[in-house]
Amino acid sequence: VEIKGLNHRIFPWVLELVSRGLNVYLCGPSGSGKTTLAKRTAEALKLPFYYTGAILQKYELLGYMDANGNYISTSFYNCYKHGGLYLWDEIDASNPGALVAFNAALENGLLAAPNGEMVEIHPDFKCIAAANTIGKGSTQKHAGRQPIDGAVTERYAFVQMDYDWQLTAAIAQIDFDGEEKPIDYKVKRSYAQADYDKYFADVQAWS
């Protein structure tokens, strides 16, 4: 695993979770860096990065057959079959039917594609879901969000993500008082293995 450049303070946790084969659910406000964090995780693991926004129709997840009988694949299909890190952004604004199909593919290790192909999950398939809510439905700030079935959410390790002002200051090269910094300011944070083990023990307890 190779980590380069500036990263959000929770990046080491997310990287460790994904490295251990856990699906991660990133919950945080807009602009907190969820997509960037997922990209950096893929880079650190040297995996291709695949992205999907809110899925409103099931075919957007699984693909479809066109008028000429050709299968039109999707990011999920390609990542599931060939390996990589798949980010499903705004999963809480997506179609419940697509979530059921997605969960079945994760649980069974098989994907029934519309072209009749039965695809086995690639050993290097990794998954991060990102949302503004915890999957309990709409909030005062985020209307139109869907409650996510417990059969789906129980397959994820939930990680709360907020703005990292140190990272913001580092990118802008300013101190928190707004003064310009003449040198690069790199945010570094490390965790002992004991801390990781305690966290993953907690994750197992939530399951």
What are these regions (language model features)?
Residues V1-S207:
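C-terminal regulatory/interaction module of P-loop NTP-utilizing enzymes
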